[in-house]
Amino acid sequence: MVPVVALVGRPNVGKSTLFNRLTRTRDALVADFPGLTRDRKYGQARLGEEHEFIVIDTGGIDGTEEGVETKMAEQSLAAIDEADVVLFLVDGRAGLTPSDEAIAAHLRKIEKPAMLVVNKIDGIDADAACADFWQLGVDDMYQIAAAHGRGVTALLERALAPFFDDLLASESEDGEIEDLTEFEDEELAVEDYTEEDAEAEFKRLQDQPIKLAIIGRPNVGKSTLTNRILGEERVVVYDMPGTTRDSIYIPMERDGREYVLIDTAGVRRRGRINETVEKFSVVKTLKAVEDANVVLLVIDARENISDQDLSLLGFALNAGRSIVLAVNKWDGLDNEVKENVKKELDRRLGFVDFARIHFISALHGTGVGHLFESIQEAYKSATTRVGTSVLTRIMKMATDDHQPPMVRGRRIKLKYAHAGGYNPPIVVVHGNMVRDLPDSYKRYLMNYFRKSLEIMGTPIRINFQNSDNPYENRTNKLTLSQERKRKRMMSAVKNRNK
């Protein structure tokens, strides 16, 4: 399972700065669900190339009028409950405050790993700034400068070590972190996608069942659809106890293909299927998306598409998951309403025009069977092996139809392309000055690859890599005859100027 890290602390200690650095965003609007997570923001983060985790930015706790306990309950208690580890941030420049002491007292009462993080230690005597915080009775404290990334990597390695066997925190004998490497911004961190890695990923996926996550807002019909897919007799068998943030993983088979259904709503016994109130856990949904191959987003046809729907869809896209859309409760709507719903879908979901849309009734089973045709199509598109020669040929066709633009008087040259990964499919394009390609041309290439490869139901990513120039930064060494010619020319110029 993907670990969850919660950032807790009073206002202005740098929680949002650290959140933005971890999620590699600028505005912290990664998955801000209106109404449900008013005081908490959720984002995807990654340490290195393989270690993914979810980070929660909680609202600040000031501990004034109503008391810190009330504020904690309102803004951060739910986030702490959802988290696997808590990072308690304090301000090294401001020093210890009563609010910090109250928060620390609360964290000591819960059975949850909590780490004290002293932020804003850049440009000051860090040890002196941290001295007061030892009063909080902590065993260790960690010094960082979130604005510059100093100490963040080492902090994460320590925080996530219990969840990843290959992570070892870099510590000295007295427990202080020595590694102060920077957690780089996304534009500086260029991932190296190789054909060997892509082939290994392809082979791994061949032996795995398709993991299908059914997600959506509360009461759109996820439970009804899950029960319809599994069959009523399966519900009792798989009515397993789970926590508020753990989904239920249900193995199943359909059309000779093995699946693992990730149920975020929770499969209920027959007597409880008609419950009208469904608890919505954001973390549970985001974890399911991270772990899935294909995401089935359920939308209520009787309600307008909400910002929550778009946030869930955006999170699935950012995670690179294949997507199928199911518009539920379609039965009983008159034709005029149906036309209006379709127009609204076209207007608001144009950015996922590659995803199949199905109009279904989970309650009566109408259209449910066809969902799996699109699920298999999307998964096949995301995991089909494509050779280097085919990708390079498609790239050449694209450049023949529409040449890359000129940059600083030079034409950008695309040389060859190869596969860089699957689920989602990644195409790596090598060339010179490719980082100067405008976004419009990148979109053109992406759409050209999608159309040529007939990719449906999954996002496609293009990674551009500059080919190394073997003569870059090397002085041009003249031959003996060239040196003599140069001297004659210089002598002639001097004589002419006399």
UniProtKB/Swiss-Prot annotation:
Stretch forming the signal peptide? none
Repeat as a keyword?
Answer: yes
- All copies of the KH-like domain together span 384-468
Sequence ranges assigned to domain EngA-type G in this UniProt record: 3-167, 210-383
Q: Which residues bind GTP 1?
A: 9-16, 57-61, 119-122
Disulphide bridges: none
Q: Which Gene3D superfamilies match?
A: 3.30.300.20, P-loop containing nucleotide triphosphate hydrolases (3.40.50.300)
Against InterPro entries, the record matches this protein to: AAA+_ATPase, G_ENGA, GTP-bd, GTPase_Der, KH_dom-like, KH_dom-like_a/b, P-loop_NTPase, Small_GTP-bd
Q: What are the entry keywords?
A: GTP-binding, Nucleotide-binding, Repeat, Ribosome biogenesis
Which BP terms does GO give this entry?
A: ribosome biogenesis
- In this chain, GTP 2 is annotated as bound at 216-223, 263-267, 328-331
Q: Which SUPFAM superfamilies match?
A: P-loop containing nucleoside triphosphate hydrolases
Answer whether the UniProt record assigns the keyword Nucleotide-binding to this protein. Answer: yes
Q: Which Pfam families match?
A: KH_dom-like, MMR_HSR1
Molecular-function annotations in GO: ATP hydrolysis activity; GTP binding; ribosome binding
Entry's family note: Belongs to the TRAFAC class TrmE-Era-EngA-EngB-Septin-like GTPase superfamily. EngA (Der) GTPase family.
Question: Per its UniProt record, what HAMAP family does this chain match?
Answer: GTPase_Der (MF_00195)
The record describes its quaternary structure and partners as: Associates with the 50S ribosomal subunit.
| Annotated NCBIfam families | GTPase_EngA, small_GTP
What is this protein for, i.e. what is its function? Answer: GTPase that plays an essential role in the late steps of ribosome biogenesis.
> What protein am I looking at?
GTPase Der
Gene name for this UniProt entry: der
